[in-house]
Amino acid sequence: MLLYNITIGIDKEIEAEWLQWMKDQYIPVIMQTGMFVDWKIYKVLHDQDDSSVSYSVQYFSETIEKVVQFVEQIEPELNKQHQKKYKDRHVAFRTLLEEV
């Protein structure tokens, strides 16, 4: 099992709206691609500052090929949508992990 993790720092002023949008719109679109079998979202409890909060959005896949296909063919357009909606109010980094 592979875990594609996206850690996102989001402006606290829009945290609730962003989280709802992720759960209601963004993540369902990703899951409909069939590239992932499950997802989870966690709030990061350490290293917080006064202006932002971080979340770990985790997508689980059975094969590296599906993750690569998602990253190369699907994610760029989704990133554009996220960037358009939240502009300079977020930062993100991605990590791919393999269960051992």
Please provide the spans of the model-predicted regions.
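Short amphipathic alpha-helical segments
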Residues: 15-41, 77-80
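Glycine-rich beta-strand-turn "strand-cap" elements at beta-sheet edges
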Residues: 40-50, 81-100
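Short, well-ordered beta-strand segments in beta-rich or mixed alpha/beta enzyme
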Residues: 3-9, 42-73
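Alpha-helix boundary/capping residues
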Residues: 25, 73-74, 85
